[in-house]
């Protein structure tokens, strides 16, 4: 299949730049698989399409503040996007790096508590970077890292490239209400519309809920650079399925639910 077969027009004014005031009041499109009929509802009405005995599987990954902006020794700006922790070292991450003349041996200063050392180039703009800090890296990221919003969500930036007055709404709303295990660099967006009251109503209707963890990776937003879709290389993502959840899912499938 050719990538051009998937092209369509999406007017910019139809791309919401702020979340709906109430999570579960986002729009919901329902397609009837038998007749193809389309209904336009609100998300909290999803409960009308679930019945007692159904199993709802949720992704409890938590988005990390993976965007860092710093300066090289020359004074040039460098933007870092953390992708995945290296298996061999706690302080080494594979990162997407934006900026000129990034090469092994370059140091990037983010603030007084954090600097990065470029170790090696992996390819496609990705580098392995060792982070130097006298504190816990996750704590520092929570303080100075920024939410990795999708590129179609625009926020004003200062001269250094950081988002101005990062919204607490962005910090909170770009997580699901059941976000728990840190590791995603993008939100599992289908889950963003659930609320605690809606989940309680779902449980009260006799619907079971099972949690799995899929750390959403950069492949969810990186561009497809090939003409033939079959030539596109999907990036791997880490996941974990607890034994209790696996049992619930297998039982539901066996029973045809």
Residue ranges and their predicted role:
Residues 1-257:
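Surface-exposed, charge/polar-rich loops and edge strands
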């Amino acid at each position: 299949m050719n990538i051009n077969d998937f092209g369509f027009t999406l007017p910019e004014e139809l791309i919401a730049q702020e979340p709906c005031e109430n999570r579960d009041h986002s729009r919901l499109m329902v397609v009837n698989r038998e007749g193809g009929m389309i209904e336009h509802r609100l998300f909290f009405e999803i409960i009308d399409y679930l019945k007692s005995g159904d199993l709802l599987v949720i992704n409890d990954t938590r988005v990390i503040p993976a965007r860092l902006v710093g300066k090289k020794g020359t004074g040039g700006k460098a933007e870092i996007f953390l992708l995945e922790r290296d298996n061999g070292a706690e302080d080494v991450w594979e990162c997407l790096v934006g900026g000129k003349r990034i090469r092994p041996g370059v140091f990037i200063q983010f603030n007084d508590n954090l600097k990065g050392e470029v170790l090696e180039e992996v390819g496609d703009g990705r580098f392995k970077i060792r982070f130097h800090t006298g504190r816990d890296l996750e704590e520092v990221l929570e303080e100075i890292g920024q939410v990795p919003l999708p590129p179609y969500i625009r926020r004003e930036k200062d001269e250094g490239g950081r988002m101005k007055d990062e919204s607490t709404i962005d910090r909170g709303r770009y997580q699901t209400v059941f976000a728990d295990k840190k590791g995603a660099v993008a939100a599992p967006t289908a889950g963003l519309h659930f609320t605690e009251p809606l989940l309680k109503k779902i449980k009260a209707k006799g619907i079971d809920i099972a949690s799995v963890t899929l750390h959403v990776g950069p492949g969810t937003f990186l561009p497809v650079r090939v003409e033939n879709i079959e030539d596109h290389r999907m990036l791997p993502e880490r996941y974990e399925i607890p034994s209790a959840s696996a049992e619930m899912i297998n039982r539901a499938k066996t029973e045809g639910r």
